[in-house]
Amino acid sequence: MTQVPGVGRHRIAVPHQAEPLSLVSQDGIALAAMHLPNPSSSTAIVVAHGFGGAHDQERVERIAQLLNEESSVVAVTQRGHGDSGGMTTLGHREPMDVEAAVAWAREAGYDRVVTVGFSMGAAVVLRHAALLGPGSSDAVVAVSGPAYWFYRGTTPMRWLHRGISTPAGRAYIRTALGTRVDPEPWPDPPPMPPTEAAARVREHGIDLLIVHGDADGFFPLDHPRALHEAGPGSELWIEPGFGHAEGAIEEELVRRIGTWAMQGAGRGASPELSG
């Protein structure tokens, strides 16, 4: 095992087959990433973590390894997180980070690229595909993502908004999570909301899978249902007992997502778990 340098108690040793990558976003942010090749696959899955994550965080790397059983994987640490530069803009500029990983995969020769995002990363992969259209992603998977910006309807989200909105809160987040939050406010009007992004993804003819747990403590079920309704032809899996994002997802569900990513819409779902 090769140790990847970095701060944070959740970093782990990356397996020998992982190839460390140094990417640069369109606006010049240095991004840490890794490539897990699968010689039998011409598909690459790009993994976008949630707020506070990183590509070498244990729970993210576990997901990447499971997806790597069927496909190659490119996992990117988004700006303001881990060893990447810059500050997080909470989904505003992060589509450029995903595009850096997608572009690398295309240049590496992969025929298909599927983006899989968790929580904040779910909103990011939706906006990435919506903004860039056909030729960006061949399919999109949004796991535990929000449908609306500025949501404060649950206790965790109220605490998060309090944290990111004050200097003391941002300092605490940096100390506790190693995540640097940009103090600049979002533009007015704000970026394209996830529901509009889901609609555009489907208008572009890009396959879209929305995955959400009925035990999610951050975003209740009106969020995935709104995304599904906004994107006609999207697929919705409501997963019994699943909590929120990378920290709660079971291996079996990750493998089903990997199967869907490899085979397309309508594959990998269990009827009793699909909605």
Task: Show the residue positions of the predicted features.
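An N-terminal hydrophobic leader/cap segment in hydrolases
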Residues: M1-V24, I29-N38, E246
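The serine-hydrolase catalytic nucleophile loop
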Residues: F51-A64, Q78
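Conserved alpha/beta-hydrolase
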Residues: A64-G85
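Alpha/beta-hydrolase active-site loop
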Residues: T89-A108
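Hydrolase active-site cap/lid region
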Residues: P134-P187
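Short beta-strand/loop motif that positions the catalytic acidic residue
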Residues: V201-H204, I210-H212
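Conserved strand-to-loop "acid loop" that flanks and positions the catalytic carboxylate
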Residues: L209-A215, P240
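Catalytic histidine-centered segment of alpha/beta-hydrolase-like enzymes
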Residues: F242-V254
